[in-house]
Amino acid sequence: MATARRLMALAAGVSPRLRPLGPRAIGRQGGPRGLSTGCSRPDRTQEAAEAEAAPGEPGEGDGSVVNASRDLLKEFPQPKNLLNSVIGRALGISHAKDKLVYVHTNGPKKKKVTLHIKWPKSVEVEGYGSKKIDAERQAAAAACQLFKGWGLLGPRNELFDAAKYRVLADRFGSPADSWWRPEPTMPPTSWRQLNPESIRPGGPGGLSRSLGREEEEDEEEELEEGTIDVTEFLSMTQQDSHAPLRDSRGGSFEMTDDDSAIRALTQFPLPKNLLAKVIQIATSSSTAKNLMQFHTVGTKTKLSTLTLLWPCPMTFVAKGRRKAEAENKAAALACNKLKSLGLVDRNNEPLTHAMYNLASLRELGETQRRPCTIQVPEPILRKIETFLNHYPVESSWISSELRLQGEDILPLGKDSGPLSDPITGKPYVPLSEAEELRLSQSLLELWRRRGPVWQEAPQLPVDPHRDTILNAIEQHPVVVIAGDTGCGKTTRIPQLLLERYVTEGRGARCNVIITQPRRISAVSVAQRVSHELGPTLRRNVGFQVRLESKPPARGGALLFCTVGILLRKLQSNPSLEGVSHVVVDEEHERDVNTDFLLILLKGLQRLNPALRLVLMSATGDNERFSRYFGGCPVIKVPGFMYPVKEHYLEDILAKLGKHQYPHRHRHHESEDECALDLDLVTDLVLHIDARGEPGGILCFLPGWQEIKGVQQRLQEALGMHESKYLILPVHSNIPMMDQKAIFQQPPIGVRKIVLATNIAETSITINDIVHVVDSGLHKEERYDLKTKVSCLETVWVSRANVIQRRGRAGRCQSGFAYHLFPRSRLEKMAPFQVPEILRTPLENLVLQAKIHMPEKTAVEFLSKAVDSPNIKAVDEAVILLQEIGVLDQREYLTTLGQRLAHISTDPRLAKAIVLAAIFRCLHPLLVVVSCLTRDPFSSSLQNRAEVDKVKALLSHDSGSDHLAFVRAVSGWEEVLRWQDRSSRENYLEENLLYAPSLRFIHGLIKQFSENIYEAFLVGKPSDCTLASAQCNEYSEEEELVKGVLMAGLYPNLIQVRQGKVTRQGKFKPNSVTYRTKSGNILLHKSTINREATRLRSRWLTYFMAVKSNGSVFVRDSSQVHPLAVLLLTDGDVHIRDDGRRATISLSDSDLLRLEGDSRTVRLLRELRRALGRMVERSLRSELAALPPCVQEEHGQLLALLAELLRGPCGSFDVRKTADD
């Protein structure tokens, strides 16, 4: 009856502590016969018993649901461990993963976990929390309450022996074959006897070893639970007034008068529960049975003796009329004693596990604060001394042999060299009047001869507006064309411009640059326009994208290129002399490069008033752009679309059979979750193929992993019939030559299926597409100013994106659009995308700004954008560029920054390349940088583990993901050079490499080689990949290569530290934390150092940290020699020297502190200065032109450095245990 009243009260929301039970749970609360149906605490009041009555036996089916309460965590502080222990003890297994399945559902604010329990009965419980780990613990606590109600736990949550669990399970009807041979009962955790006089909480009596199963949590749980390293935790406890706990001065035996016991019981009304929880938390045990034992004697008056074996043997005696009363009084006396020792907080609640192990934490923290000892072999020390005596640092700084000041510093700014022709890339020379007249007449003749081809071109909606458009462009410096999808603006307007100029006899003056947001659209549109102009004028149309270029002839030229290419052209021709028009297509996408380009083009109007700017968009906020350019005219052009029939999620589920996807339907109808069901996508594509109209299928997916996932599912489903389908992935990871296949017409009887990101959303037309499957999602980079890391998130697209995607189905015939989201979601979508400039890191943008307009501050320059970024974000970018030595304190480019300006990649990677040229290990760094731009491995959701194993094998014992890249690419180059086709395919298959990505990487290496040559770092581009070239003299020195990479990426440095404390207060001494300058991070399982059982060095470098689900983690890392960190990083060092021993540390970071004898430390400091001098010399002069004597000095210095880094790390070893 009490249970029924409780359920009714809960359903009515009376209890503030427990959530209402699910309807399926009500009426199924009876326990099995012979088992206790309650989990009430000893000696509680009747009201408390009614309020806390436990649920009974699970229902007969698999659907019983019980919602967890946060308060249950007080009763079951380590619920997941307790559940594992019960099932493990009962079944004789080491882990209960198969019997406990956690299913996660991500809500907009709360995480939900449904825990499926498969023993002793199938039952489900639910938990909620702001983090996944919190929700799991809530669900596990609810399950523990069930277990206790079923009699599977004792009154104090203690476990039974395996034999008793066998009897209990028989009553539940558990099948006999699920029982394994039971293991003998084991004590919870070992402990040591201590004298109470010496007790310090967390001291020797506090157990420092965590329970094994808690240490071996799943990796995703580790990501969610949050960690604090030992040093950070100790600094927090010093600020906590409760941290300094008192020593014990009591004896080992206590027996007081009854009044004292009664007062203690008043203060601790549930003392036995409190004692059990304290011991369980302190000892990481699932039971306190073996550490607190009662012995009660007597008839009328009961005398109870409590022997407490933690934190040391203590005995408490009390009396009472009943056994329970006497035991509670003794337990209350024990609680009073623990509180006097500081082992219970002021609210009479247990402390955290870490606080009970505070002495061990302090000892570990002290170990971490000690500097690491360095021992350099005596022969190397003597070599360093000899070198420094021969080439003293201070006198060399002022040597006149190089005359490093004034005019002899290389002029690498924007004013260096002749202007470049933006169309052809050759030096710009204006046409003479005679040349212009001759070329214009030739173009007119060619135009007249092209008649039949022009007639074949279909009439497009933009054609009737030609005069309006052309007159507006002629009369206004800027014009915005708002052309609907399908109006023909992308292909036709450049031709209309060329036609007017040619037919008016001034065709040589028409040189149009048309930007496209992506490489594939620039190439495909150029080819389309070239075809429409016909063979006579085909050579007047060209394209230029990264790694591929086919420029048009000079005069009367149409050049299609990406925005990045035009930005590069502006460096060598700031006023775009020789260009008549710039057409910016698809400006509504608001990528960061386009917004940056608009700043430059707006300022360019003063330098080149004859230049005409045309902005084109289908769905953008065109009035905003008009206002940005001073109210320029907006010309609206209607488009033409064939009818497109739309289906939304509810329609799609009805077609496929709604019962097959209950979770998907419920999920989208009720939540804002951005999760894509790849099985649903696959089934929809197969359904369209089986029942839909003939024609191609274009499927929009968020990213590469989803593309590969759907591709593999389709291939498996199609099986033997795969030859009847052409499945084509489209992604920026794929080289242009492979992407062009999407435009080809498949053979008769073959259906084309294109799996693409938003790369296929605009500018390109795939003629045979009839069906569009729109996931409604895309990847979007977002920058967290607080953590200073980026997060590539899957988010909903905007309504403008939905319109564009739908339009791909109706370009050439009627079509169908299948939206994998409900109609209600469409209304919630933003009208336009958030501009990229507002949500991404700005280092590249600031560097570009300093190249184009060095006289302006970064904030001043970027304030002129259509949407100005956060000033704090700009300042952070400036600070980073100053930290890596690219900008000085006045925000001018340094000599290093001028070199970086030539290299088209992230500033830190560009710095690594520059340093690699100076340190003569260039080729491996070019490979690393290229692979960080494009992953060479053929990785997918299904084969990640296999790829990780291959990377580990390729890395050997280098401890480096980056050197795994080098070995993979070098092996491929070797196979290409000497082996046949079969050997090449075997190499790709064995090493899980992706041939198109390797081709792209090869192209990047070639491009970087050209950049390095332009930066005066090598004598000729081919030297960069030539093993015998001076720039590769030390390319086989792995520690040097990793050190140079670290020097480029610094301050991206990680120090590995032993021991951590979870956010829940659990101390894990055998785990490791990864500390950076900004705080703790996690290593992703994809880096080989995540699973390494032994690290040769405590220091790692990395390129990028990414934020996911509230945690920051690193995907790529390399172990680096501590001496490389000391010698190759920027900034100053700090030395403390007592004349015998000295410590040296980085002034800008607490991540490196080394100790050695005074002579060793002094020599290392001088060696560091010599290396800094070498870098500065090399940056101030053409590297290949340095005098022979300087080349010789640098060669000796690098040989010495390589030998030093070959030495062992010695005391820097860190052993990782299996519980990490």
From Swiss-Prot:
In the record, which positions carry Phosphoserine?
Answer: S252
The DRBM domain sits at 79-147
User: What are its GO cellular component terms?
Assistant: cytoplasm; mitochondrial nucleoid; mitochondrion; nucleus; ribonucleoprotein granule
Q: Which Pfam families match?
A: DEAD, DSRM_2, HA2_C, Helicase_C, OB_NTP_bind
This enzyme catalyses: ATP + H2O = ADP + phosphate + H(+)
Q: Which CDD domains match?
A: DEXHc_DHX30, SF2_C_RHA
Q: Which SUPFAM superfamilies match?
A: P-loop containing nucleoside triphosphate hydrolases
Motif range (DEAH box): 585-588
Domain (Helicase ATP-binding): give its ranges.
470-638
Q: Kind of enzyme, top EC level?
A: hydrolase
Which example biological process does GO assign this protein?
A: mitochondrial large ribosomal subunit assembly
What does the UniProt keyword field contain? ATP-binding, Cytoplasm, Helicase, Hydrolase, Mitochondrion, Mitochondrion nucleoid, Nucleotide-binding, Phosphoprotein, Ribosome biogenesis, RNA-binding
For this protein, the Enzyme Commission number is 3.6.4.13
Domain Helicase C-terminal intervals? 680-853
Matching InterPro entries:
DEAD-box_helicase_OB_fold (IPR011709), DEAD/DEAH_box_helicase_dom (IPR011545), DSRM_2 (IPR056755), Helicase-assoc_dom (IPR007502), Helicase_ATP-bd (IPR014001), Helicase_C-like (IPR001650), P-loop_NTPase (IPR027417)
Subcellular localization, per the record?
A: Cytoplasm; Mitochondrion; Mitochondrion matrix, Mitochondrion nucleoid
**Region called Disordered, residue ranges:** 12-66, 176-226
Q: Where does this protein have compositionally biased stretches of type Acidic residues?
A: 214-226
| Molecular function GO labels | ATP binding; ATP hydrolysis activity; chromatin binding; DNA helicase activity; G-quadruplex RNA binding; RNA binding; RNA helicase activity
The residues that the entry says bind ATP are: G483, D484, T485, G486, C487, G488, K489, T490
Stated role: RNA dependent helicase. Plays an important role in the assembly of the mitochondrial large ribosomal subunit. Required for optimal function of the zinc-finger antiviral protein ZC3HAV1. Associates with mitochondrial DNA. Involved in nervous system development and differentiation through its involvement in the up-regulation of a number of genes which are required for neurogenesis, including GSC, NCAM1, neurogenin, and NEUROD.
Membership in a protein family = Belongs to the DEAD box helicase family. DEAH subfamily.
Q: How does it assemble?
A: Identified in a complex with TFAM and SSBP1. Interacts with AGO1 and AGO2. Interacts (via N-terminus) with ZC3HAV1 (via N-terminal domain) in an RNA-independent manner. Found in a complex with GRSF1, DDX28, FASTKD2 and FASTKD5.
Q: What is this protein called?
A: ATP-dependent RNA helicase DHX30
Q: Which organism is it from?
A: Bos taurus
